[in-house]
A protein has these predicted regions:
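A structure-centric signal for secondary-structure junctions around beta-strands
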Residues: 4, 11-13, 29, 139, ...
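Active-site catalytic loop in hydrolytic enzyme cores
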Residues: 10-88, 101-104, 108-110, 176-178
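Proline-centered loop/turn at the N-terminus of a beta-strand
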Residues: 5-6, 15, 122
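Short, small-residue-biased leader/transition segments that mark boundaries at the very start
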Residues: 1-8, 184
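A short C-terminal boundary segment appended to hydrolase-like catalytic domains
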Residues: 169-182
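Non-catalytic surface loops within mature trypsin-like serine protease
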Residues: 20-21, 168-170
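CN hydrolase (nitrilase-like) catalytic-core segments centered on the catalytic cysteine
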Residues: 67, 73-162
């Protein structure tokens, strides 16, 4: 309904924006899965739904390097979303994040590698790190993972630009040998 649409437009969203080579907005993804959890850290309780509305759409955009699927942070814990991105044609998937220090140390690398393997996509994962108001402490690690689950480039903390070569022939070979999409 239009009333629901108006409410959606007025609420804040945690989103990922894709800007093209001309500086124009090419795609926008509003985070589907809000971080409403309790963590054994100095903050304890996180409730993104107090401040944000969840999104409604899976987003895959054409880019000069391939079809790019967009996600945000906690979305990483939902393989169904990543599967939907793959089914929509994604070849690479972004995962900008702010995992807590506790959850990031335990799960970050495992999750980014698992999503790459499951989808047979490159995962481009960047996580802020450090101490923030609230108090909130984030894990911080950036990595590029290939469709076989290998970490091609990585930065444990601090600022960095990561580069890796996308081997589309190898990606096609992996996808041809492991026909995971037909088993969904």
């Amino acid at each position: 309904s239009s009333a629901a649409s108006d409410v959606y437009k007025r609420q804040a969203h945690a989103c990922s924006l894709l800007v093209d080579e001309y500086g124009e907005l090419a795609a926008r993804y509003d985070k589907l899965h809000l971080f409403d959890v309790d963590v054994a850290d100095n903050r304890g309780r996180y409730r993104e739904s107090d401040d944000y509305a969840h999104g409604a759409n899976v987003v895959v955009a054409d880019t000069p390097v391939g079809k790019l699927g967009l996600t945000v942070c906690y979305d990483l814990r939902f393989p169904e979303l990543y599967s939907a991105l793959r089914q929509a044609g994604a070849e690479l998937i972004t995962a900008p994040a702010a995992f807590t220090a506790v959850t990031g140390a335990a799960h970050w690398e495992v999750l980014i590698r698992a999503r790459a393997i499951e989808t047979q996509c490159y995962v481009l994962a960047a996580a802020q790190g450090g101490t923030h108001p609230g108090p909130r402490e984030t894990h911080g690690q950036a990595a590029i993972v290939d469709p076989w689950g290998r970490i091609l480039a990585e930065q444990a903390s601090g600022e960095a630009v990561l580069l890796a070569t996308r081997d589309s022939a190898e990606q096609a070979s992996i996808r041809a040998r492991m026909l995971s999409l037909i088993h969904i």
